[in-house]
C-alpha cells in the first residue's frame, strides 16, 4: 500500500550489494589487515584498490554486465579479491570445485558461458585441459589467467606460454579510478555455484546481490562475529562463496587467514599465531581436529568459534570439540540457500542439561537463518505441513530472501524445485515441538528395511560414539528378504582395532535391532572437496556385495 506523500527514489532506495561492504571497510578499517597468506599481507584500503583494478582490467578484456568469470583456486588471496573484483565489473563469479577434472571443468565452462577463467598454478593443467577440450569441440575458449603462488611465484614465464596472462598482470593493467558497476536491481545475479556437473544436466545455482548481502549479514550476526574477527579459512571459499562469509567478514572489517592446505597442524599453528576467533568447516574438519596427535595440538589462545555444516555432525564430535575449548555453531543448508539456511540457536534453558545432552541439542539443524523467512517439514506428495512432534518425518522446505534465483538455463528444474511456492530440499527431517528442525536423511539415502525407515544419520551417530571409530557412513544394501539393510563403511582410528561383529553388537545395544548395520566394510571413505562423504560411491559398492540372506544369516 502506497501512502500519500511517499515515493521511491534514489534517496531512499539503493540496490543491496556486498560491494558496499568493501567500500565501507576501505574507509572505516583502511589500515587494518584484510588478508594474510604466509608473509603476504594486505590492508582493507589495499584490497579495495586491487579489486577496483581487477574490475577495470576485466572491463578492458571485454567483460561486461551479465558475463561470467570463473576461478579454479583453493583458499588463496586471489579468491578473496575476485569475490569483489568480478561483480565490480558487473559480471557473475563462478567458483569451480578444485576436485573437478578437465572434462567436467570444460562442461561447466561451456554451460556457464565463461569468458575468463582464473586458475591457480596448482590446478593450471586442469584448466588448460578444459580449454583444450573446448577448442577441439569448436567451442569458444575463455581467456586463461594464471594465479602463481604468491609466496614464491612458483610458475615462471619460461615454463608456460608467453601469451598467458598472470594474475598480477591483470591487477597492474587496471585503473584505480575505474567506475565500479553496481547492480541496477538488487535481484541481479552476483554469482553462479554448481551443485553437480554431469555431461547432461549440470545445475548452476544463481545467487543475487540481495541474497548475498542479506545472508552475509545474517551469518555475521548469528555466529557472533563481532567487530574485526580473525577468520581462518578451513571451509572452501569456492563452496557457496565461502558460505557468504567472504562478504560477511568484509562487512565488519575482519581479517581473512588464507590456508591452501588444511591439516590439523596448520589449523593449530594458525590459530596460535594469528589469534583466530572464528573458523568453519564440515564434520571431517572437526574429526581432523579432535583426532590430531598431541604433538600437533596447541592450547587455544582465546575463544574460537567453529561454524560447522555441509553434513550433520555427530553429537559425540561436537562434545569432543567443546572439550578442546571450541565454541560450536551448527548450521544447515544447501547451495540453493546460499549455504546456511538454518542455525541451531542456543537457548539458555539448555545450560542446565548434562554436557552430552547439550551436544545432542546442538547437533540438531535448528531454526531458520535470518533472511530466510520460513522453514517447514512437509509431505512431499500432499504438500501439507506435518505436525511438529519430533517424530513425523517429511521433506524440509524453505522460502525467503536467501533462496536462489534459480538454476542457470534450466527452467524446468527451477520450476520443480519451487513447486507450491517452496524450495524443496530433498532432505528428510522432523520438526520438534520447540520449532527446531532435525535431519534424518537425504530422501535418496533413507534405508527401508522390512517396511521400516532407517535413518543413516542415526546409525552413523551411534557408530561415532565407539572409541575406535574415526569415520562412518551408512548406506542401503540390497537384501532379498528385507529389501534393504544398513551397510556401514567405517574407518578406524590409527592404532585401533575393532571387528565387524563388535561394531554390529555395539549398535544393537544402542539402537533397535532392525536399525543396526548387518554388514561392516573397513576402508577410507570417498569425499568431496567440501568434506561430504560421496554416498553414491558407497551405494554402488554395497550393491556389489552378495546379499546377506543368500549366506543364510539370521533374519532377526
Curated annotation (Swiss-Prot):
It is found in: Peroxisome. InterPro entries: AMP-bd_C (IPR025110), AMP-bd_C_sf (IPR045851), AMP-binding_CS (IPR020845), AMP-dep_synth/lig_dom (IPR000873), ANL_N_sf (IPR042099). It catalyses: butanoate + ATP + CoA = butanoyl-CoA + AMP + diphosphate; hexanoate + ATP + CoA = hexanoyl-CoA + AMP + diphosphate; pentanoate + ATP + CoA = pentanoyl-CoA + AMP + diphosphate; 4-methylpentanoate + ATP + CoA = 4-methylpentanoyl-CoA + AMP + diphosphate. It is an enzyme of class 6 (ligase). Its EC number is 6.2.1.-. GO terms for cellular component: peroxisome. The keyword Transmembrane helix does not apply. Belongs to the ATP-dependent AMP-binding enzyme family. Catalyzes the ligation of CoA on butanoate to produce butanoyl-CoA. Can also use hexanoate, pentanoate and 4-methylpentanoate as substrates with a lower efficiency. NCBIfam families: PRK08162.1 (NF006020). This is Butanoate--CoA ligase AAE1. It comes from Arabidopsis thaliana (Mouse-ear cress).
Amino acid at each position: 500500500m502506497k501512502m500519500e506523500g511517499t515515493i521511491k527514489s534514489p534517496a531512499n532506495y539503493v540496490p543491496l550489494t556486498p560491494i558496499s561492504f568493501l567500500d565501507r571497510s576501505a574507509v572505516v578499517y583502511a589500515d587494518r589487515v584484510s588478508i594474510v597468506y604466509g608473509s603476504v599481507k594486505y590492508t582493507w584500503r589495499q584490497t579495495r584498490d586491487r579489486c577496483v583494478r581487477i574490475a577495470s582490467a576485466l572491463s578492458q578484456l571485454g567483460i561486461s554486465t551479465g558475463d561470467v568469470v570463473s576461478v579454479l583456486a583453493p583458499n588463496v588471496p586471489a579468491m578473496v579479491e575476485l569475490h569483489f573484483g568480478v561483480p565490480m565489473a558487473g559480471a557473475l563469479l563462478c567458483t569451480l570445485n578444485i576436485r573437478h577434472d578437465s572434462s567436467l571443468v570444460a562442461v561447466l565452462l561451456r554451460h556457464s558461458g565463461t569468458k575468463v577463467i582464473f586458475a591457480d598454478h596448482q590446478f593450471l593443467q586442469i584448466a588448460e585441459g578444459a580449454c583444450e577440450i573446448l577448442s577441439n569441440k569448436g567451442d569458444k575458449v575463455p581467456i586463461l589467467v594464471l594465479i602463481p603462488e604468491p609466496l614464491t611465484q612458483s610458475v615462471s614465464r619460461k615454463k608456460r606460454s608467453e601469451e598467458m596472462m598472470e594474475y598480477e598482470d591483470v591487477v597492474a593493467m587496471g585503473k584505480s579510478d575505474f567506475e565500479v558497476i553496481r547492480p541496477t536491481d538488487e535481484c541481479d545475479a552476483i554469482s553462479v555455484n554448481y551443485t553437480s556437473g554431469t555431461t547432461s544436466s549440470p545445475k548452476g545455482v544463481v545467487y543475487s546481490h540481495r541474497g548475498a548481502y542479506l545472508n552475509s549479514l545474517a551469518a555475521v550476526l548469528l555466529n557472533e562475529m563481532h567487530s574485526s574477527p580473525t577468520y581462518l579459512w578451513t571451509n572452501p571459499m569456492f563452496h557457496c562463496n565461502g558460505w557468504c562469509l567472504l562478504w560477511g567478514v568484509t562487512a565488519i572489517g575482519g581479517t581473512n587467514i588464507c590456508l591452501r592446505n588444511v591439516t590439523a597442524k596448520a589449523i593449530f599453528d594458525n590459530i596460535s599465531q594469528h589469534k583466530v576467533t572464528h573458523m568453519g568447516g564440515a564434520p571431517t574438519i572437526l574429526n581432523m581436529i579432535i583426532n590430531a596427535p598431541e604433538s600437533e595440538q596447541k592450547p587455544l589462545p582465546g575463544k574460537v568459534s567453529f561454524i560447522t555444516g555441509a553434513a550433520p555432525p555427530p553429537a559425540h564430535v561436537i562434545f569432543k570439540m567443546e572439550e578442546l575449548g571450541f565454541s560450536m555453531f551448527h548450521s544447515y543448508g544447501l547451495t540453493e540457500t546460499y549455504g546456511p539456511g538454518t542455525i541451531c540457536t542456543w537457548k539458555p534453558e539448555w545450560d542446565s542439561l548434562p554436557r552430552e545432552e547439550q551436544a545432542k541439542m546442538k547437533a540438531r539443524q535448528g531454526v531458520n537463518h535470518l533472511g530466510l523467512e520460513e522453514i517447514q517439514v512437509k509431505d512431499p506428495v500432499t504438500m501439507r505441513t506435518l505436525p511438529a512432534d519430533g517424530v513425523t518425518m517429511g521433506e524440509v522446505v524453505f522460502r525467503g530472501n536467501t533462496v536462489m534465483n534459480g538454476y542457470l538455463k534450466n527452467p524446468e528444474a527451477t520450476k520443480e524445485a519451487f513447486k507450491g511456492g517452496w524450495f524443496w530440499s530433498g532432505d528428510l527431517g522432523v520438526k520438534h515441538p520447540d520449532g527446531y528442525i532435525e535431519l534424518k536423511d537425504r530422501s535418496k539415502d533413507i534405508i527401508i528395511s522390512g517396511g521400516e525407515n532407517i535413518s543413516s544419520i542415526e546409525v552413523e551417530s551411534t557408530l561415532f560414539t565407539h572409541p575406535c571409530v574415526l569415520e562412518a557412513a551408512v548406506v542401503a544394501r540390497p537384501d532379498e528378504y528385507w529389501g534393504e539393510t544398513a551397510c556401514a563403511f567405517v574407518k578406524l582410528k590409527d592404532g585401533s582395532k575393532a571387528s565387524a561383529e563388535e561394531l554390529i553388537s555395539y549398535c544393537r545395544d544402542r539402537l533397535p535391532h532392525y536399525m543396526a548395520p548387518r554388514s561392516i566394510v573397513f576402508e577410507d571413505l570417498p569425499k568431496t572437496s567440501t568434506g561430504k562423504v560421496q554416498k553414491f560411491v558407497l551405494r554402488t559398492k554395497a550393491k556389489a556385495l552378495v546379499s546377506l540372506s543368500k549366506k543364510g544369516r539370521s533374519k532377526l
